[in-house]
Amino acid sequence: MPTISTAECFTHGKVANELHAFARGYPHEYLFSIDRKKVDISVVAGMFIPTLTGVRTLLHFEPLEPRLVIDTVKVYEQDQDCIMACRMAEAVMRVTGADIGIGTTAGIGKGAVAIASQDKIYSKVTRIDADFRTSDAKKLMQREKSGVFTALRLFEEFLLEGEFPDSYNKYI
C-alpha cells in the first residue's frame, strides 16, 4: 500500500484531507476518476507549512530566500514556488518515511504543486494566477481550489500511469 505525506502552503492541508477521505472511502469535494476499491493508499501526514520557520523545523531544510515575508509567511515568485514545492515534496517524503510526497506553495503568480517518489519529482502550476500581497480573498481561494485540483489530478495520473506523463515539468 503506497503511503503519502503532504507539505502544503496555499492549499491549507486540503490535499491531505481529500486523499484521506478517498483512502477511507467517504465522499468529499473532489470527485476522483479512479475506483477507490482498486486503489489502496494511506496518508501518513498532512502538514500546513506557510512559514520559513515551519520549513526549517518540520521539513529540515534551508528554504530559498523569499521575495518578502508578510507576518512570518514566505512569499515567492512563481519560479521560486516551483522549486520550493519540489523541495517540500521531497522533504516531507523523507521526514515521514512516505512513498510519495506532495508539496504546494504559492505567493506571486500561479501556485506550484509537486509530487515526488523515490526516483522522480515533477511539478505543475495552477490555472489561477494571484498575488498574496494584493489579491482579494476570493481570488486567493480560487487559486487554492485550483491547487487542490491540480495536486489531486497529478496524483491520480501518477497512480493510473505508474509514472508521470512526459508533459509535466521536471524541476530537478
Swiss-Prot record:
Pfam families: HcgF. It comes from the Archaea. Belongs to the UPF0254 family. This is UPF0254 protein Mlab_1743. It comes from Methanocorpusculum labreanum (strain ATCC 43576 / DSM 4855 / Z).
